[in-house]
Amino acid sequence: MANRKIRWGIAPIGWRNDDIPEIGAENTLSHLLGDIVVARFEGTEAGGFFPEPQILNKELQLRNLKVAGKWFSSYIIRDGIASAAQAFDTHCQFLQAIGAEMAIVSEQTYSIQGLEANIFRDKPTFSKEEWKCLYEGLEELGAIAHSYGLTLAFHPHLGTGVQTKAEVDQLMAHTDPSLVSLLYDTGHAYVSDGAFLPLLDDYMDRIKHVHFKDVRSEVTDACRRDGLSFQQAFLKGMFTVPGDGCIDFTKVYRRLIRGGYDGWIVVEAEQDPNIAHPLEYALKARRYIDSYLLAGGEKQATI
């Protein structure tokens, strides 16, 4: 059931983590890109350790790889729209220079994803006035993205003010679809709400970028019970690559195909590379994709 319009990538976060720079620091750009080629993915997302465009483009061209996009931490509520817009403009200049398509935005005001706080209990919320500021700010950023030929994809994320299905509903209802699209991340949706399909079913027309992240349910239950932080939870192995956890990606992929999705699907799994060998897990994801998604096979759903 292959769709030639869909491009498959794998994120650098399995090799190195921008939030914990010491993890995987030995994995160079050449190492990462070489592993991506071996695992037969078409591209990646830019990490914080990626070099300037002139150097990066040469490395990508030599391997026939693309960069789909890059994460941007917005602080619209904390710093104001003008400040966020200025920083985002610089971000978009970089994306345009490397031939990327997606500007992945997460509002980080009050975020606890980098703190030692209970990720399952202590997520922030926004006031009515803060929500209004966020709507306006994201539309401003979306217009900037368009001016560079890019698409803004908002990333609901654990530990932020836009995490749950209800919060995504609120954001989607109050933003212009032509300016603010949605990044669909299976793992964040499942850990947040216990379900990964409702977002996909409700917002197929808004989804312009996809992360395939699997979840180890037993590890997640233990992390929830122990009140771990986001970083503690992913270092314990809460996330993994497709086919190694409890999510049935055949259901997700079929819905994407039926909905006419034609963007990137990026495998993303925060893990400790000293425990989960990056190339081993990239190959594991590749085998699952080939066997159960592109070949139209079946894998029994476990949730």
Swiss-Prot record:
Cysteine disulfide links: none
A GO MF term: myo-inosose-2 dehydratase activity
Presence of keyword Nuclease: no
Keyword Lyase included in the entry's annotation: yes
Keywords (A to Z) from UniProt: Cobalt, Lyase, Manganese
Catalytic activity: scyllo-inosose = 3D-3,5/4-trihydroxycyclohexane-1,2-dione + H2O
GO biological process terms held by the UniProt record: inositol catabolic process
Pathway as given in its UniProt record: Polyol metabolism; myo-inositol degradation into acetyl-CoA; acetyl-CoA from myo-inositol: step 2/7
One of the Pfam families matching this protein, by short name: AP_endonuc_2
UniProt EC number: 4.2.1.44
Taxonomy, superkingdom: Bacteria
Species of origin: Shouchella clausii (strain KSM-K16)
Family membership noted in the UniProt record: Belongs to the IolE/MocC family.
Co-factor(s): glutathione; Co(2+); Mn(2+)
Enzyme class: lyase
Stated name of the protein: Inosose dehydratase
